[in-house]
Amino acid sequence: MADKLDIKAFLDKDEQKDLLRLLTAGSVDDGKSTLIGRLLFDSKKLYEDQLDALERDSKRLGNAGEHIDYALLLDGLKAEREQGITIDVAYRYFSTNNRKFIIADTPGHEQYTRNMITGGSTANLAIILVDARMGVITQTRRHTFLVSLLGIKHVVLAVNKMDLVDFSEERFNEIVAEYKKFVAPLGIPDVTCIPLSALDGDNVVDKSERTPWYEGLSLLDFLETVHIDSDNNFSDFRFPVQYVLRPNLDFRGFCGKVASGIIRKGDKVMALPSGKVSHVKSIVTFDGELDYAFPPQSVTLTLEDEIDVSRGEMLVHPDNLPVVDRNFEAMLVWMDEEPMDINKSFFIKQTTNVSRTRIDSIKYKVDVNTMEHSSVPFLSLNEIARVVFTTAKELFFDPYRKNKSCGSFILIDPITNNTSAVGMIIDRVEKKDMNIADDFPVLNLPELGIAPEHYEAIEKAVKSLSEQGFEVRIEK
């Protein structure tokens, strides 16, 4: 009985640990997979059968000579092992006494930029590896730019293979100075630099005696203690409605995930786009009612008044509204094998909202290696650009730098259903500055000879179309 209680206590404690999502990025052979493998190995997070398989595979496929090749723990695809590179995003989970971790090992090659964007989309922290012999190279700059684009606020520059430069403090300081000079204009608020050797384990889990001049934490100690709670936006309440729950006539609740901000029982809320106002009656979860909710909790809100709210709409505080607009510009990462057709319309999915959208213009493409801007007529796979959009119906958004959940979106090809691109909203664009015709369809009911008693039925049909992403405006 005591053993069972101990197990339950352990599971309860593990459940209460906070979670750090991190990604690793770096050039080919900088040692990303080796570093994560070493982290798992030295923190005693591998089972005996995994260790046995690792030793066998190291002899057969390894690239570490007489050493165990820790990279094989993460390079799961056959092509990756044969080429000694990472192609897909490899996820690994482990926990320590202080924190739980999900690691995304992302590919370093430019042709797999979309894989890195996918792996880093939910990350709190990025580990960017550089080879101590090579220093800051083009790929280092590219990965850092992508990390800044994703809004990741914590970056660890892991200067790996310090054993190959005799753990030189001078060499480490040269690399740090060059990197910090490059990263300063990108606006990443927290950059930490750590000298290490992934193969030998120096400064990975424990401080190394071979770097007496380094006064900082080991990598694992830093990951356990880095403060990420303040990264969440607790100021701007945004609740995209995912589903309207009505199990019986006495209950009507709005289900969704709190994207940002805090909501309490009794708070005044406004439904967008209708502008109707009510108060929160209850905050319901599977485990019972709450007095308040915060991101990223999934809850059901009930309101004091019967107001019409559907999937894709949003509940907010009336004195703190998002941008409500159809015109905006964003940084777009093209992820489709097919090049962009700028004359084609797409579905845009932003929070739970879906609409038709068109691409009005490409302001410039960013060369991710040199940071130079250039004018282009379209985008190809893995290319990044600043793009202007017009949507068929209004979206409710915040700039991505302020609110990741409400400032990000995907473009969906309406024919293939492929995810064509991901985007990070910069801000609204004033229509007067666009000089672009508004060519979405308009139904002028009086001109069509439709009697007023039929207006309500037509409005319901148009609303149904709107929920599917087809916007038709009505004029009465």
Swiss-Prot record:
Record's keyword annotation contains Transcription regulation: no
Residues engaged in binding GTP: 26-33, 105-109, 160-163
Location of region: G4: 160-163
Transmembrane spans: none
GO biological process, one term: hydrogen sulfide biosynthetic process
HAMAP family named among the record's database cross-references: Sulf_adenylyltr_sub1 (MF_00062)
Assembly notes: Heterodimer composed of CysD, the smaller subunit, and CysN.
Name under which the protein is recorded: Sulfate adenylyltransferase subunit 1
Annotated organism of origin: Bacteroides fragilis (strain ATCC 25285 / DSM 2151 / CCUG 4856 / JCM 11019 / LMG 10263 / NCTC 9343 / Onslow / VPI 2553 / EN-2)
Organism ancestry: Bacteria, Pseudomonadati, Bacteroidota, Bacteroidia, Bacteroidales
